[in-house]
């Protein structure tokens, strides 16, 4: 999954806290 600056994975859509 590509983690974006906002912490959201663009592919899986999982949010990184």
Curated annotation (Swiss-Prot):
Q: Report if keyword Signal is assigned.
A: no
Provide the protein's localization: Secreted
Expressing tissues: Expressed in skin glands.
Q: Which GO terms describe its cellular component?
A: extracellular region
- Give the keywords, sorted: Secreted
Predominant localisation class: secreted
What protein family does this chain belong to? Belongs to the Frog skin active peptide (FSAP) family. Septenin subfamily.
Q: What does this protein do?
A: May act as an antimicrobial peptide.
What's this protein's name? Septenin 1g
Q: Give the species.
A: Osteopilus septentrionalis (Cuban treefrog)
């Amino acid at each position: 999954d590509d983690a974006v600056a906002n912490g959201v994975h663009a592919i899986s859509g999982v949010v990184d806290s």
